[in-house]
Amino acid sequence: RDSRNIPILSLDSMAVYRGLDILSAKPTDVMQAQVKYLGIDIAEPDQNFSVVDYLNYLLDIDFPKMTYDMDIIAVGGTGLYFSSMIKNYEFRPTDPTIRAELEQLNYGQLMKFHEIYNIELPSVELNKRRLIRNIESSLLQDSKYVFPKLNIPENNVGIFWNNPDYKLNIKKRTSDMIQNGLADELSLLNNPSKTILQAIGMNIDTDIESNINQKSYKLAKKQITWFKKEDSL
């Protein structure tokens, strides 16, 4: 415990949800009693929690003012959360009718949709969710909104730990999650949001431990690459 009791801001898109303590490796009650944690337990599991929701939460707790009054450690997590805090965040609203129609298409059909309507594919690893969002962005390109960057200091310092044993750490964390009752936690979720259903550990029927490990390895590598390219750190 640091004598200055520096608050910790979670950038984890799953830790925002109540009831996902094991899945998101949320700090224990003892840890939360010692240090103030922000960005956790702020949404119900049936809520589709977006980046805009996260930014509105930060404004609700007067986070910009806090950053001038004290040091804050941001940990994790979702690179887009961090980027949206310090830059203008551009987003397009979704159209429920368009989304419902696109969700009926499979991966191959979505790729064909891009080809037929000459929609440029995103330069990221493709999956059904990203293809749908890319089509929506193209169809709704005139409906772009900008969430202004938060008024927070620009002298941010990034700490990157090039841990050669990160895969071993992931394996241990996964094993601990399963032993601590991950399956029971997930079974108790009532009508989980689409955001949660996309999380690592969800919708896995067999060999859950191996699946979580493999997806976590990929995510960890992606996060390291993303944050090292962030020019504000």
Where is each model-derived feature located?
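Phosphate/pyrophosphate-binding catalytic cores of soluble transferases and nucleic-acid-acting enzymes
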Residues: 1-233
